[in-house]
A protein has these predicted regions:
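Second-shell loop/turn segments in exported
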Residues: 32-42, 74, 90-91, 106-117, ...
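DG-centered beta-turn motif at the end of beta-strands
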Residues: 33-36, 127, 139-153, 160, ...
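Short beta-strand-loop
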Residues: 67-106, 183-196
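Von Willebrand factor
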Residues: 23-88, 98-146, 173-184, 191, ...
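Bacterial N-terminal signal peptides
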Residues: 5-14
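VWA/integrin I-like adhesion module and closely mimicked acidic/polar interface patches used
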Residues: 150-198
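C-terminal "exit" segments of structured domains
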Residues: 208-298
Length: 298
């Protein structure tokens, strides 16, 4: 028996430090927020405030600390062009009211910037690398993308989605139906919720929560976060989020559904069939630039 104990101790010391130090969390959640040119400074502020308010919500705090491990890890970045992702808050352990409040305060105090194009695919690929170095052992890895337009820069969004799903990263979406005038003159995308549903989201129990306007964003963020933290998305495939009792964060966290089989192929959990095609953003962009300037963007 003593020999086995010594052998076990030697095996532990032989493990890489990263493998020993990884802390178990109920959820590793990457929040990806659109700051492309279609978002004006006021809209960017409303998005930021939506997340700050949500993380200060007592119900969400209880949901975060009420799961099996009582903690989650969160990273927050903003994105625009395929090459432009800005990490505002790196992976942070949220395991108490104090740590959650500090996260919200740091987010509130971060500067707000606006960039140019819309590369959902760039955001997804950036998130894949972000998860690879998270330093946490998570029951679930979830990327949440919010935005007010379809992909028009970088690789096809469906190809980037496949890369993420192959790494067992589920993708949820928070499309913002924006009826405000676009500063570049691009037309509004009334079917953006369907684009996100069919072309962006994927993975077991992935879902879309629609913000009907930027003013509606705080409500949508709160509902989305509660469902993600409590693992209460639909069981099979992506769909619109079901109406849930969201008043008791602790009860939601404790009522989470059983996890899917570890061998589950995440790439099976997508919904094809978006009639305009998942390259619609790229085509709209080319048509717009050709019509307005007689050329296509670089």
């Amino acid at each position: 028996m003593r020999y086995l104990a010594c052998l076990f101790a030697l095996l532990l010391t032989a493990l890489p430090a990263a493998a020993q130090d990884k802390k178990e969390v109920d959820l590793a959640l990457a929040l990806a927020i659109d700051i492309s040119g279609s978002i004006d400074p006021e809209e960017a502020r409303l998005q930021r405030e939506g997340y700050v308010i949500a993380f200060r919500d007592p119900v969400i705090v209880k949901a975060i600390t009420g799961g099996p491990n009582g903690r989650i890890a969160v990273a927050y970045f903003e994105w625009s062009d395929s090459w432009n992702q800005k990490l505002l808050i790196d992976w942070t352990l949220l395991d108490s009211e104090t740590s959650i409040a500090a996260f919200a305060d740091k987010l509130s105090n971060s500067p707000i910037t606006i960039a140019r194009r819309t590369s959902i695919s760039g955001a997804i690929r950036y998130a894949v690398s972000l998860f690879a170095r998270s330093g946490y052992e998570a029951d679930r890895k979830v990327l949440d993308i919010s935005g007010d337009g379809s992909n028009n820069d970088g690789m096809l969004v469906t190809d980037a989605r496949t890369e993420a799903l192959q790494q067992r990263i589920a993708i949820n979406g928070l499309p913002i139906i924006n009826d405000r005038p676009n500063p570049f003159g691009f037309p509004a995308e009334a079917d953006l919720d369907q684009y996100y549903l069919h072309c962006v989201t994927g993975g077991p129990r992935s879902f879309v929560e629609v913000a009907k306007s930027f003013d509606d964003f705080p409500r949508a963020v709160r509902k989305k976060l509660l469902q993600e933290v409590a693992d209460r998305g639909p069981r099979r495939g992506p769909t619109d989020a079901a109406a849930l009792p969201l008043a008791d964060g602790t009860r939601l966290a404790q009522a989470r559904r059983p996890h899917d089989n570890g061998d589950e192929d995440y790439t099976r959990f997508v919904r094809p069939g978006y009639e305009p095609g998942c390259d619609v953003g790229e085509r709209r962009s080319r048509e717009f630039w050709q019509r307005r300037f007689g050329t296509t963007p670089d």
